Amino acid sequence: MASSVTACQGASPYQPRNYQLEMLEASMKENIIVAMDTGSGKTHIAVLRIKAELDICPPDKLVWFLAPTVALCIQQHEVIASNLPAVRTRTLTGLDKVELWTEQSIWDAVLNGYRVIVSTHAVLADALSHGFVKMSRLALLIFDEAHHCTRRHAANKIMRDFYHPTLTKSGPGAVPRIMGLTASPVVRSNHQELLTVESNLDAVCRTPRVHRQELVKFTHRPHLQQIWYTPTDPAGFKSASQTLGALYHAWETLDIGDDPYIQRLRKSPLDDTALKKALLTGKTYCREQLRRFVDRSRHIFEELGEWAAEYYIYASIKQLGDRVRNSYMSGDWDEAEKAYLVDFLSKIPASEIQLALNDPGSFRISPKFESLLNFLDSLDEREFSGLIFVKQRATVSAMTSLLSVHPCTRERFRCAAYVGWSNGSASKDILGDLLNMQLQRDTLDDFRSGRKNLIIATDVLEEGIDISACSVVVCYDKPPNLKSFVQRRGRARRKQSTFAIMFPTDDASADVSKWQDLEQAMIEAYQDDERQLQSVSALESLDEEVMERLTVESTSAVLTADMAMAHLHHFCAVLPPQPYADMRPVFSFETNEDGLLKGTVILPSCVHPKVRRTEGRRWWRTERAAMKETAFQAYKALYEFGLVNDHLLPLTKRPELKSHDLGAMPSILETSEQYDPWIEWAYSWSSPDIHQSRIVVRMNEGRGDELCMRLMGPTYLPPLSPMTLFWNNSTTFTVTFEAAERVPLVPLSSVEDMRAITALYLKATNSRVCSSERDFTALFAPDLHHTELKGWLNAYEGCDPAMEVYSRGHNPLLMGVVRDHSRYGEPFLFRKWLVSDQNPSCSVVELECAPFPHRRNLLHRQRLANSQVDVDEETPESAAKNPIVAADACTIDRLPFTMAIFGLFISAIVERLETELIATRLRETILRDVGFKSTDHIITAISTPFAHALTNYQRYEFLGDSILKFSVSCQLFFQHPNWHEGYLSEGRAMIVQNPRLAKAALDTGLDAYIVTKRIASRKWSAPLISEKLERVPAKRQMSTKVLADVVEALIGAAYMDGGHATAQACIRRLLPEINLHAVDTRTATRSVAPESARHMMNERLKDHIGYTFEDESLLVEALTHPSCDYDSTTQSYQRLEYLGDAVLDMVIVSAIFNHPIQRPQGDMTKIKHAVVNANLLAFLCMESATSEEKLDVAQTSKDSFAVTTSQESVELWRFMRYRGQNLNAARDASLARHRALRDEIASSLLHAPHYPWHALSRLNADKFFSDIVESVLGAIFVDSGGDLAPCEVFVERIGLMAYLRRILDQEIDVRHPRSVAQQLAKTNIQFVLQRVPNEEGGASYQCSVRIEQAELFVVTGCLTAEEAEVTAAVEAIKFLTRDEGSTPLNTS
């Protein structure tokens, strides 16, 4: 059947090696046979070659990978599919019954949509011979175990019958490129055959030439050991084993005339010829079954001994009986043949074998097997992993059983059998084949994982099959040829491993050096380095002087060739570290006709493509000199490209990234005093240009009478927005201001009257003794003409004794404020008169009053029983009993309280006017070029939280922070196309850090306009002209953070006022170095994508993203992981990921901020952090998939097939371009956790009232999953010319916006479990993390939870520190809420 595996299980750690890149480059220039030792990474070179070919070939071309066995096809397909997850690949083997596909339509359907096919040689040879596949459709042919391409092998048939004729007829453009892979190009110990293999494959044999030392470093040759044994007498079996002797006697005396086949032929006169042939040859189906069974039994006796032979005979007879009883057999075998075989074997005295024997002497074994046991017993390895090669399949099953039960081995070895997937003649055998093919499916995985540590196998495991490096390999029989010797030895590739060969004591050809000598002769045929090793060593000892020199005039810094290597390595060492990527420079060399060398160096993929690859300029005799000169040229190019400063050092943590020297800025700074607009008003009264505004006060939104007043000032009055004042929980006052108008010719007397009226209002509502000064800067009066003010003042100024008011029968609704002089004039509100008639001659008059309201800050709603009541506010005594006061001790103000109440509003109005004047001044001075339409947003941005104003900057600071980060990121990205992500991140950090923003506030004078004064305090007093004229300028203390916050808040305010354009103008005013308008987003330097990018980045991906790129190189770059070192023309995605991170922040923050439900800054910050959480982005990346149709072939009857269709999901992560088995393993581990947690996380995102912190922490996805989302987002932003709209579409497409809307609409709880636990504990709760190393060199994490230094519990066995902390917090929540009905956080 076809294999469609997408993950390579148990992949061993793998890192890019120079010699593999060398072989890749060689294969791109010509057809080659890669000849390297087993385990040195030939398959990974093939994977790189496939990637490169898919990048350049048309999309209708195929890459065809050929392997000699089905098992090897399955394994190699797993490796290819794991490394090319976005490419559709499949296997075609006999398991698919390919030999029955006899129609072109079937082949067309099978190959439709696939780019890489893995098959045996015979499958492709047959397909080519029948014309189902054309040679012209193949782009690349890869021959694994290429030494098979000789004589009549199917591999050679492909080349001889199809490749070479097509090449001769149509030229090289009509045939595929060729790559061969082999560890032993000479099969039969004849090194001359190398030339034949090269000719047949139209390729030249290559081993890594320059990097031979690296190849040796990674390839471990085992210790070679001989195991001698005394051979068994072949004729001794008759007397040694009763069961085997009886079987052999029964076979020798078998009468062919009793065979059912012979009897059937005798009954039919038409079958006379067949009868004569059968009698002459003695071959019938039953006799062949018995003959092979007897031969195998004898072989097992000779190889393993009597016990194994008897076990094999007994187990085979039992198996046959079970099959007959279960109707297992089918086909042409009739009932008579069944009965005949069963009857024959029933006469053999085979008794049941005892397996649980403790005495080694009970196991009658052969001298050969005893030698093997002695050898195995001599091994002293804690981590044993071994492989035993035997000749026959029957020996595999018998030896596996014997080793599994023998007392000397059963406790030490965990054995498994492996014979591959091609049944061969065993498919016709129903007797003596004890191996269950299904049981070996997991054998290799079990061996890799350590569940099995010893495999007994036939030669199927010689070639190609990827098994873990073994510490011991035993050849139970001599290798038949040099190829087997090399291949088997290559399996023992652990350090200090052993390769053992068993020899009989009478073998004259046991000289192991025979194979070693032949192998050395073969190597010398294609490896110049080995033949010329001494001359090369002599050359390298030469002292070649490299005279290159670079001097920087401005600093006198000098770079010489001798220093260049150290400088270049240092430059790479300080690049942003990346897991799975080698950050070292990679050197390679080319040789000219004179044997001279020229170097090339390739830097890590985060470096810009223009300077990533540098070639030397001269030819040298030694590698050392070539490396020096190449390193010099590379570092010189980095300097000229702006990645190294004038001191010839990398820019990281250097002044080049610091636009301002901030030094060590303290956290608290001395700043200008808050700008006081009343000072200017005080001076303006000397020659006033009087303006006034009509004020209308309405109670409860207009239900009731209006109170109309006037506000007068000596200069222009800015427009004031309506104000809502909260009297109590049921009463509000709305204060509106009409447009101010200029009032000419106001007499001085009228101004004085207004001063007196203002003082009257302020005194009427104040229990404190008021100042006698009346030179107020802002004046208030009733809405009367100025000529009427004197009469009004005479009517309402002063007070009357309460008894006098009582005697006049004054209207209670027009009563003024009651003042009790027995209590030092304490004010009360009149309720009613109380008259006592107990003494008729002298009635007692009293007043029932209400307490005078203490609240002064009417801008905020009254907060009853709230622990957060302001310190200067008291909870009203509305529930207290109304006080009774004596009338003769009281006076009552003439100004009715219905009018006097306005005095309580004056402080709020004056404070509001003051803030408006500050904002207006700021708008007209520092921010005059920004283009604010009004001051409303400015007021919010400059009001600090401790001013207790109606609004403060916190929400705008949240918005402005993201806008600033976004703007700075864009500016640096487009302005510095040569900078890698490390420089960009550091440059951004320098600009957006609090000290830089605080300095911007100080440099522009913004600090003076930050409102910190407490609004509407009970100690408030009206500003006076005399005080303001005498005011001495002072300083105030302010934190660096407040200054920075206001800068960010103003940026947010500008965005709210006029969108991105106004925000950019504000940034430009406060931070002159950021001018995004001057940057052309269309001219950013981009990587040069390979021509083939359009083929790899097919329509599936474009549909997936939902955006069509004008410049597809951006998409290629967005999907290029830093480990992708094989493509030096494309930069890794780190720059785009850096930009996409800021774009994502901007998209998310805008959605949060503009939601109808306004949330405080803290809640918005929590939501943002939850939504852009890397694990959530990674989960959505894993979930983001498009569906496409997949064609396949299904068998409908014995000989017919039909095309079937199905849907296949293609996830976004599959398109990432990378290299490395360690990344594969990490990716597959993340995907396995995703499969385990998917339902839980998906359900939480759709239905849970809480954010799935716990499940996401257990997901622990590798960072590259979330990086892909951000890098694609950055690519869309760049390609669209800086348009956020298509970015929002992509964020919507992956499902992030839908979840954000659910969080906002349904108020999902996004608090982190640690925060919830800390709130519940109401005391000091500690989470103590600890890394716990394990024996394998890894580590797990544990977290202990402590309250008041007492340990509650410990969570252990977590994959990461984050998972440990979150799990511990969840358990703490359960503990702290154990007595409650529910918990505040979902702990599932």
Swiss-Prot record:
Which cofactors, if any, are listed as required? Answer: Mg(2+); Mn(2+)
Disulphide-bridged cysteine pairs: none
Annotated organism of origin: Neosartorya fischeri (strain ATCC 1020 / DSM 3700 / CBS 544.65 / FGSC A1164 / JCM 1740 / NRRL 181 / WB 181)
**Keywords linked to the UniProt accession:** Antiviral defense, Antiviral protein, ATP-binding, Helicase, Hydrolase, Magnesium, Manganese, Metal-binding, Nucleotide-binding, Repeat, RNA-binding
Residues of the RNase III domain: 919-1059, 1098-1281
Site, Important for activity: residue positions: 1263
Record keyword Metal-binding present: yes
> What's this protein's name?
Dicer-like protein 2
List, for all copies, the residue spans of the domain called Helicase C-terminal.
371-537
Where's the motif DEAH box? 144-147
Q: Which PANTHER family match?
A: DICER-RELATED, ENDORIBONUCLEASE DICER
UniProt similarity note = Belongs to the helicase family. Dicer subfamily.
Tell me where the transmembrane regions lie.
Answer: none
Q: Which gene encodes it?
A: dcl2
Domain of life according to the entry: Eukaryota
Q: Which residues form the Dicer dsRNA-binding fold domain?
A: 564-658
Q: What Pfam families does the entry give?
A: DEAD (PF00270), Dicer_dimer (PF03368), Helicase_C (PF00271), Ribonuclease_3 (PF00636)
The UniProt entry, under CDD domains, shows:
DEXHc_dicer, RIBOc, SF2_C_dicer
Which positions are annotated as binding ATP?
A: 36-43
